[in-house]
């Protein structure tokens, strides 16, 4: 991460489930700290739980829902 790359802070409001071939990715719903009315679904690699703050390098793309 360099100084030129803008990051967006988002708070995990709900853990939706595990995905990936071995369950190594967690699907979460996040709410942006700058705009609390805006929420999206993202895939997160590694340990994550509710109320964690994520630094999103890219904040426009939304993950597909679990089946």
Curated annotation (Swiss-Prot):
Keywords: Cytoplasm, Ribonucleoprotein, Ribosomal protein. Coiled coil: none annotated. Pfam families: Ribosomal_S28e. It comes from the Eukaryota. The keyword Ribosomal protein applies. PROSITE patterns: RIBOSOMAL_S28E. GO terms for molecular function: structural constituent of ribosome. This is Small ribosomal subunit protein eS28. It comes from Candida albicans (strain SC5314 / ATCC MYA-2876). The lineage of its organism: Eukaryota, Fungi, Dikarya, Ascomycota, Saccharomycotina. The gene is RPS28B.
């Amino acid at each position: 991460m360099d100084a030129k790359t803008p990051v967006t802070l988002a708070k995990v409001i709900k853990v939706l489930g595990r995905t990936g071939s071995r369950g190594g990715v967690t699907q979460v719903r996040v709410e942006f700290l700058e705009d609390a009315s805006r929420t999206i679904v993202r895939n997160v690699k590694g340990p994550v739980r509710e109320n964690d703050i994520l630094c999103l390098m890219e904040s426009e793309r939304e993950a597909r829902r679990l089946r």
